[in-house]
Amino acid sequence: MESIIKLIENEGGGFLDFFFHKSKPTVQKDGYKYEIFSIELTEDRTVELTGVQVYPYYEHKLCHLKVDNTWRKTSINHIQNIIQKEIDKIYK
């Protein structure tokens, strides 16, 4: 979890936007799959994902997911990889 926070802090902005990407990244939590629109580091140093639920059914409202210790390690690693790829695109 701390590695994600440091990665976003080093990026400088604290906010990554995926809204206009043709292929938005997805992440799974508790049997649900979410399409990510943005990743934000909040003022209290927590990471929050904003997106929509796409599995098992599509939900027509924004979800705000706080990334904490309740997430599986594989999902946290996946989020970290998404952030790293986006940062690499920005500074390439």
Which sequence ranges carry the predicted segments?
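Mixed-charge, Lys/Arg-enriched low-complexity segments
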Residues: K61-K92
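N-terminal trafficking/processing presequences and adjacent post-cleavage segments
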Residues: M1-E9
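Short, aromatic- and cysteine-enriched interfacial helices/patches
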Residues: I4, F15-F20, Y91
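Acidic, low-complexity, intrinsically disordered interaction modules
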Residues: L16-H21, T26-K73
